[in-house]
Amino acid sequence: AGYDWPSLVKKDGDELFDHYRHTLEELGRQKGLLGLIFNKSQNKFQDPAKLRRLIVDLIDKETWVSMSADVKGDAYEGLLEKNAQDTKSGAGQYFTPRPLIQAIVDAMAPTPGETISDPACGTGGFLLAAHDYVVKHYPNMTSAEKKKLRGESFKGWELVQATARLCAMNMLLHGIGSQEFEPIAVGDSLAADPGERFDVVLTNPPFGKKSSTTI
């Protein structure tokens, strides 16, 4: 208990440092997307004063809860795209250009009730575009259909832990997934039959990561 944002804002100095570290550890033990996002996360700050400035002076001054998922999600997508364009980071191999994704999703035209998978999901672009397509083209979905769309319709696999973490955050900010359903799995989707079947498969096969699996 007590590992939340208000508790961080109240702390300062070494006490803040310790509480921040314990908060990261606790979040990493959670189920669902939160656990994946914060799994093995570490405090990279060396100076407690800088951490406090980030928490109190920058982040806490914004009213994040009043922002829609579209605003927060689009901002995060923009950061992912900017990072992918940095050739030194090597992140481009996990980020498919959004216009290409949109063209493929438009061609597949997913519908409410269908299950959609990306066996090499990277930062989650195909899954998010498929979600947006269904929402846009089927505005009269029932509450049950909307709940199923957000909570049960998407599943992605990502081999690289750090990239899976980026994808999980992307999904969370867009309101997809839940504590009961984890839409992102860390692992090689070709290593074994996952035992699941899907109506639609959208993917851009990875070319930047070697695997022991041969096809």
Question: Which functions belong to the PLM regions below?
Answer:
Residues 1-112, 175, 179, 183-189:
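Non-catalytic, mostly N-terminal accessory regions of nucleic-acid modification and defense proteins
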Residues 213-215:
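A mobile, often basic/glycine-rich helix-loop segment
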Residues 90-203, 208-210:
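Conserved S-adenosyl-L-methionine
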